[in-house]
Amino acid sequence: MSSQQQKQPCTVPPQLHQHEVKQPCQPPPQEPCAPKTKEPCHPIPEPCNPKVPEPCQPKVPEPCQPKVPEPCQPKVPEPCQPKVPEPCQPKVPEPCQPKVPEPCHPKAPEPCHPVVPEPCQPVAPEPCQPVVPEPCPPTVTPSPYQQKTKQK
């Protein structure tokens, strides 16, 4: 565009006076050229501003969103579910069974087996302890006799 404007005024005056035309030809093209170059300069920095924040915005939220929810969800529910039910179930029945039959086996296994497991499971180990020692001491001495006689 600027090349066409320079050619038009420059081509006409040189025909009249080449020497005189050179001087006035230089300043006129500078005047119209100056404002024209400034105008397109203004819109250039404007689109520059949105270009900078645009790539910045998507870069920040993208890595933030997947990093926070992804590790949070699987870490919380996975270890919580297996850890709670697994140790809870075996811990309750395991200590109840070995604690009661251990002292009962040497003292009186026959009468203790049917009486101990029944109240131990529904009631708890508390009533099991006072009931076992009381009947067990008197049956300690006859227990070997009963076993021998029953075997015969």
Swiss-Prot record:
Tissue: In squamous epithelia lining the nasal vestibule and in the hard palate.
Biological process annotations from GO: keratinization; keratinocyte differentiation
Claim: Cytoplasm is one of the keywords in the record: yes
Domain of life, per lineage: Eukaryota
Disordered, as annotated region: 20-40
14 X 8 AA approximate tandem repeats: annotated segments: 27-137
Per-repeat ranges for Sequence: 27-34, 35-42, 43-49, 50-57, 58-65, 66-73, 74-81, 82-89, 90-97, 98-105, 106-113, 114-121, 122-129, 130-137
Annotated Pfam families: Cornifin
Described purpose of this protein according to its UniProt entry: Cross-linked envelope protein of keratinocytes. It is a keratinocyte protein that first appears in the cell cytosol, but ultimately becomes cross-linked to membrane proteins by transglutaminase. All that results in the formation of an insoluble envelope beneath the plasma membrane.
Protein name: Cornifin-A
Organism encoding this protein: Rattus norvegicus
Gene encoding the protein: Sprr1a
